[in-house]
Amino acid sequence: MTLNTDLIRTRCLEIEESVSRLERLQALSRDAFLADQDTLDLACYRLLVAIEAALALCYHVSAKRLHRVPEEYAQCFANLRDASIIPADLTERL
């Protein structure tokens, strides 16, 4: 089965946009960051978007290339590592 390049492109863009928004928040001091509920909400939302996009990519690749999907989120990236689709150091970070 072939990978859905539109899905992959969309999810990668979601991750890139989220990381970019989160990186901009690094300019804030810790106190300023923690004092602003809207900023905290934005950070939480962008983290969730990036995590969901990464998992969607993982499950898509698992289904199409490995012909199976893991029962647990944590196992998804390990399956791709074991199949030599992603490097071990990336698996550890994810």
PLM segments and residue spans:
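Solvent-exposed interaction patches of small proteins and small membrane subunits
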Residues: 1-94
